């Protein structure tokens, strides 16, 4: 071959290899060099202008600080920071927003009237008064308070005894200090040789309610092995103590009984003596290993590929200003009660209000076991603070990676404002499911559909062992959905017995019983269906025999509608076990284009509830749990179905939800629906290390029922439609075909950060 030709070929080969290497190298770095996806703002409609109203906004740090300064000045020099307070001290327990009266709020929102005065509700523990008590004070106007008024009697029908006060962090600290410094030293040999206690390897978990009579403050406390990085809840050791901590001076607290392996003792000194003389049957419990079953550390090395992630290539189709959220379809404001948790207000679809308030009211768990601590558990989690215990959410796990994270500020259990960073997230959820679709082959060939998506606001309450994921979801159909998932650690008891222990759950570890329990969640739905005057209507279907019109000798069983207007509250109260109409909705006298009353249907997603028997002395405090659904007249004097004061006094509640049902008329009134969603949990091996969200979800839907003239999602811009003779691969025909073009850009992703530990 000619040398020049050979050199030319070698040169071309070198250039080709160089070009290929360049392409490969640049493609490997193409992610960082690709253009950013263009951010397309949400579509503008008359109803999408965000409300400037701050009626329902949580108190700002400045407002919280102003209220604390005002209270400190006006309640006297004896006020102590709650974070250091003893039971005998006076302290400000909590400060949060005092919600305005609905009439005043609507006068402002709907008729342009002046906004109601912004006020705070403060809870004061007066442990230092001659007659210790709990008082509730309304403080205003904000942001510059000048007055306070005592609303305790107005809200609770009388003074609040001091023993009803919720447990605060300082009391838990004082309880553990008392046990470690006063009680545990009475049994050093037993604790060291049987439970491997070295001064730091045990932790207390407590039961509530405290005591069996009004005025009691005596709590069963179980000890668990506590190793850093492990779930303490899965490591019971079998030792439990009944501590009376009702005295104002912790020095006067006393252990009334001790429980160990099915037997009761006067105190730990007796237990120690019986152990030393060889009369005590024991089960030695080794310390758990750091990599054991209760650890949430990954069992495998992280290895690509990553799990699927959800991105919005063109940016979110919603705006958040303060606590107001607007989208092309929905507007609402959200709040975060310190005790009740997530709530949303003034919820409108295309500018028309659907509901004034949808909120969490209570979260109840009731346990069974053969140990005193576990069998006495009736946790009312609002008393611990569903909002206070809403911790920072993790991008890409707790919420989609692109979610908008919202900080929350609270003041409870301390004299200063506490930041809960990223405790609420807002995002659009693509559910991987068609919202509607049809493939037609009869009389024509076409396809039409719309991918399902929703606007979601979420928070997670980590109360003790459980984590509750609260979602309010707003759909393009005009439906509003509430759902709660339960996850976290189960509560366990030590298996000291044999088969009798299995009456209360399943064995989930070495001498560890997963204790059976019930979950019940209560919600308030203040619906305003096309106005304040609503009716409750129940519809169902029954089969009726009918002769075929074309041949009377033929018989058919034909479904036929039944319809009943529920005129009184007692007719709209449905206890568990009673049949709930399959269609129950709130309606207005206005009609749609087809002559039907415009309405919103309440559809509950919950298994049958398991409620505390009516003969229980605790039941009246939990009476909301009797009912799967109740509709009552709305009253300012009935704002909540539960109370944070019930946790420590279930046997003499001041206000009872069942008394809301007093047979008043429901015809053309402002109505509130109260919904209970619940499930039974029998823990099993697959609840270790954590209960998973799959299968542990309940909630409800508010669905338009003849509220519109057609499905409003037909106007969604993401709708897909094409016929057989059209090229569905063209972006101009099918918006989904544009996806490939969008995929050439890089979505705008925030950097990962976390401040929640």
Curated annotation (Swiss-Prot):
Q: What is its EC number?
A: 1.4.3.21
- Any one Pfam family here would be Cu_amine_oxidN3
- PTM comment: Topaquinone (TPQ) is generated by copper-dependent autoxidation of a specific tyrosyl residue.
Question: What residues form the membrane-spanning segments?
Answer: 5-25
List all disulphide bridges recorded for this chain: 399-425, 731-738
Q: Which sites bind Cu(2+)?
A: 517, 519, 681
InterPro entries from the entry? Cu_Am_Ox_Cu-bd, Cu_Am_ox_TPQ-bd, Cu_amine_oxidase, Cu_amine_oxidase_C, Cu_amine_oxidase_C_sf, Cu_amine_oxidase_N-reg, Cu_amine_oxidase_N2, Cu_amine_oxidase_N3
Amino-acid positions noted as binding Ca(2+) 2 in the UniProt annotation, renumbered to this chain: 569, 638, 660, 662, 664
Report the protein name in the record. Answer: Amine oxidase [copper-containing] 2
Membrane topology is:
Single-pass type II membrane protein
Extracellular side: which ranges? 26-757
Q: What is a single molecular function from GO for this protein?
A: copper ion binding
Q: How does it assemble?
A: Homodimer; disulfide-linked. Probably forms heterodimers with AOC3.
As stated in the Swiss-Prot or TrEMBL entry, residues carrying the post-translational modification 2',4',5'-topaquinone are 466
Record the organism.
Answer: Mus musculus
Broad EC category: oxidoreductase
Q: Where in the cell is it found?
A: Cell membrane
| Membership in a protein family | Belongs to the copper/topaquinone oxidase family.
The record places the following residue ranges in the Cytoplasmic compartment, namely: 1-4
**Ligand binding (Ca(2+) 1):** 526-528, 670-671
């Amino acid at each position: 071959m000619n040398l020049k030709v050979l050199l030319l070929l070698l040169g071309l080969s070198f250039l080709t290899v160089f070009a290929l290497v360049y392409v490969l190298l640049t493609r490997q770095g193409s992610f960082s060099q690709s253009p950013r996806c263009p951010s397309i703002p949400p579509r503008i409609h008359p109803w999408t202008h965000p409300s400037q109203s701050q009626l329902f906004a949580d108190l700002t740090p400045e407002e919280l600080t102003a209220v604390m300064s005002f209270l400190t000045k006006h309640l006297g020099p004896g006020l102590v920071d709650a974070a250091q307070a003893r039971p005998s001290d006076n302290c400000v327990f909590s400060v949060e927003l005092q919600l305005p009266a609905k009439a005043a709020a609507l006068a402002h929102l709907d008729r342009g009237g002046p906004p109601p005065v912004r006020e705070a509700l403060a809870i004061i523990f007066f442990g230092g008064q001659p007659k210790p008590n709990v008082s509730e004070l309304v403080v205003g106007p904000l942001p510059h308070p000048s007055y306070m008024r005592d609303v305790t009697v107005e809200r609770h029908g009388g003074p609040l005894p001091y023993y009803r006060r919720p447990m605060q962090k300082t009391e838990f600290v004082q309880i553990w200090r008392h046990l470690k410094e006063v009680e545990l030293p009475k049994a050093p040999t037993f604790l060291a040789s049987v439970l491997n206690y070295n001064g730091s390897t045990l932790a207390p978990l407590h039961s509530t309610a405290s005591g069996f009579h009004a005025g009691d403050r005596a709590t069963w406390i179980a000890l668990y092995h506590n190793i850093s990085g492990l779930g303490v809840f899965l490591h019971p050791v079998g030792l439990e103590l009944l501590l009376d901590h009702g005295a104002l001076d912790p020095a006067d607290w006393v252990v009334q009984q001790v429980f160990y392996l099915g037997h009761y003792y006067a105190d730990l000194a007796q237990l120690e003596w019986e152990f030393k003389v060889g009369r005590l049957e024991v089960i030695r419990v080794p310390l758990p290993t750091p990599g054991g079953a209760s650890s949430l550390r990954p069992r495998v090395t992280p290895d690509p590929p990553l799990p699927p992630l959800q991105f919005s290539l063109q940016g979110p189709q919603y705006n958040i200003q303060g606590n107001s959220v607007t989208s092309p379809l929905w507007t609402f404001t959200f709040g975060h009660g310190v005790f009740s948790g997530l709530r949303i207000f003034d919820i409108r679809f295309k500018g028309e209000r659907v509901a004034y308030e949808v909120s969490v009211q209570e979260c109840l768990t009731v346990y069974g076991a053969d140990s005193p601590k576990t069998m006495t558990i009736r946790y009312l989690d609002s008393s611990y603070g569903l909002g206070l215990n809403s911790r920072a959410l993790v991008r890409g796990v707790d919420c989609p990676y692109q979610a908008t994270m919202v900080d929350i500020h609270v003041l409870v259990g301390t004299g200063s404002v506490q930041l809960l960073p990223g405790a609420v997230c807002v995002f659009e959820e693509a559910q991987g499911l068609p919202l509607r679709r049809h493939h037609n082959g009869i009389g024509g060939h076409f396809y039409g559909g719309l991918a399902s998506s929703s606007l979601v606001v979420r928070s997670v309450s980590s109360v003790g062992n459980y984590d509750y994921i609260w979602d309010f979801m707003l759909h393009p159909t005009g439906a509003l959905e509430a759902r709660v998932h339960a996850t976290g650690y189960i509560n366990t008891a030590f298996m000291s017995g044999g088969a009798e222990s299995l009456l209360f759950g399943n064995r989930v570890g070495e001498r560890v019983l997963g204790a059976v329990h019930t979950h019940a969640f209560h919600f308030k739905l203040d619906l305003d269906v096309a106005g304040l005057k609503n009716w409750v209507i129940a519809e169902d279907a029954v089969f009726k025999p009918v002769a075929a019109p074309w041949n009377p000798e033929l018989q058919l069983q034909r479904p036929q509608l039944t319809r009943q207007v529920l005129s009184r509250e007692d007719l709209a109260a449905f206890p568990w076990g009673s049949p709930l109409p399959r269609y129950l909705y709130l309606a207005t006298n206005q009609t749609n284009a087809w002559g039907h009353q415009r309405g919103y249907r309440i559809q509950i997603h919950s298994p049958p509830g398991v409620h505390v028997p009516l003969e229980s002395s605790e039941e009246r405090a939990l009476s909301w749990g009797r009912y799967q659904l109740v509709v009552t007249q709305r009253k300012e004097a009935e704002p909540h179905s539960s109370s944070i004061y019930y946790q420590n006094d279930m046997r003499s509640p001041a206000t009872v939800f069942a008394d809301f049902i007093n047979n008043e008329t429901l015809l053309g009134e402002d109505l509130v629906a109260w919904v209970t969603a619940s499930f039974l949990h029998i823990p099993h091996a697959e609840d270790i290390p954590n209960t998973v969200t799959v299968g542990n979800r309940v909630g409800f839907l508010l669905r338009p029922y003849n509220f519109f003239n057609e499905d409003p999602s037909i106007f969604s811009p993401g709708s897909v439609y094409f016929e057989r003779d059209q090229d569905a691969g063209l972006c101009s025909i099918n918006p989904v075909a544009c996806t490939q073009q969008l995929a050439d850009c890089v979505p705008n992703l925030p950097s990962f950060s976390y401040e929640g530990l």
